[in-house]
Amino acid sequence: MALVNHRENVKGRAQILAIGTANPKNCFRQVDYPDYYFRVTKSDHLIDLKAKFKRMCEKSMIEKRYMHVNEEILEQNPSMNHGGEKMVSSLDVRLDMEIMEIPKLAAEAATKAMDEWGQPKSRITHLVFHSTLGTVMPGVDYELIKLLGLNPSVKRFMLYHLGCYGGGTVLRLAKDLAENNPGSRVLVLCCEMMPSGFHGPPSLQHAHLDILTGHAIFGDGAGAVIVGCVDPSGGTNGVVERGVRRYEQPLFEIHSAYQTVLPDSKDAVGGRLREAGLIYYLSKRLSNDVSGKIDECCLAEAFSAAIKDNFEDWNSLFWIVHPAGRPILDKLDAKLGLNKEKLRASRNVLRDYGNMWSSSVLFVLDEMRKGSIAQRKTTTGEGFEWGVLLGFGPGVTVETVVLRSVPTAKLK
């Protein structure tokens, strides 16, 4: 493919300089989760529904997930256990839990990213944070300033309620901030924790079974990256002097970023915050909407800006795709004609963590980087120079981020 040569402008491109992730301590094996879920919600009498849920979990391609809500929490807060037509008011309990725990998990991921970055925290100039839940004023961004010991004059951007595409949104915003504020370093965070989304199973007669689908795939997690524009003339050899790394080490370059709404897809996925918590809707058509429209509506537009001529070989890219679920990944594979290994990083994250909403693509980004190094690939993009990050969620809104890898030989 013929790519626009922009090496002379690389100083102005935003780069991902470090990545950190974190999960709650409670790990649930997928094979055990149906028995656990129906037991703690006192729903073992729903035999047919439990069998249906077991089949969902078996087909999910997930092996384990991490969640804050455990049996002890449910025993202390029985109002969270009800499902279907028996849901009761429990929003206060759920929000209080999220307001308390989301900042802690986000701070853990941020600390890992800053440790890898190796620079003084005083260099952080901007903070971008997203969480679908846990709304409070002042927000989690305010709490993170205190928890991380950041300068109180750090410029903060707080985003709520975006859902699964939020991981792409924060990167797009961070790119604009880094490239338009010389010398800036942007701490970017997504943290998703689902106390508001935990409900007991509905009855078979109840029409809304989407909650059951969510319980088969959703997990909690936080991802953090640091974004800035590094002058390549300064080198990237990671020399450490007096405990401070002299040079930063870019992992990926954020070449461009786009947001698109897929046509006629508003009802494919969404949610409403009710007195009983978050009630979400997951249409069976979601996988078809995403796989059927994403190439024409998103990929073609995004890569037309970076590629001079028509481009058809999607296998010449590395792929960082939101692991929304097995059906979406399978259909995207088939629609784009991708080789089997192309969505390896996304499938690995789905297997080990489930769908962590907006945080997921940051986990996939980390998996891509680590897997490339472990397999001795020549670049952080599995040996490929160019790649794409896709986040999608309610709308259906799609964030398309064009990335450029760096040679793994530069990483020490």
From Swiss-Prot:
GO annotation (BP), single: terpenoid biosynthetic process
Xref: InterPro entries: Chalcone/stilbene_synt_C, Chalcone/stilbene_synt_N, Chalcone/stilbene_synthase_AS, Polyketide_synthase_type-III, Thiolase-like
Active site: C164, H322, N355
Record has Transmembrane as a keyword: no
Keyword Repressor recorded: no
SUPFAM superfamilies noted in UniProt: Thiolase-like
Record EC number: 2.3.1.-
An annotated Gene Ontology molecular function: identical protein binding
Keyword vocabulary terms for this entry: Acyltransferase, Transferase
A Pfam family matched in the record: Chal_sti_synt_C
Top enzyme category: transferase
Catalysed reaction, written as an equation: 3 malonyl-CoA + acetyl-CoA + 3 H(+) = orcinol + 4 CO2 + 4 CoA; 3 malonyl-CoA + acetyl-CoA + 2 H(+) = orsellinate + 3 CO2 + 4 CoA; 3 malonyl-CoA + acetyl-CoA + 3 H(+) = tetraacetate lactone + 3 CO2 + 4 CoA; 2 malonyl-CoA + acetyl-CoA + 2 H(+) = triacetate lactone + 2 CO2 + 3 CoA
Record pathway: Secondary metabolite biosynthesis; terpenoid biosynthesis
Tissues where this protein is expressed: Mainly expressed in young leaves, and barely in mature leaves and twigs.
Family as reported in the entry's similarity comment: Belongs to the thiolase-like superfamily. Chalcone/stilbene synthases family.
Subunit comment: Homodimer.
Function: Involved in the biosynthesis of acetate-derived aromatic tetraketides natural products, precursors of daurichromenic acid, an anti-human immunodeficiency viruses (HIV) meroterpenoid consisting of sesquiterpene and orsellinic acid (OSA) moieties. Accepts acetyl-CoA as starter substrate and produces orcinol as the major reaction product, along with four minor products including OSA, tetraacetate lactone, triacetate lactone and 2-acetylphloroglucinol.
The name this protein goes by in its record: Orcinol synthase
Taxonomic classification: Eukaryota, Viridiplantae, Streptophyta, Embryophyta, Tracheophyta
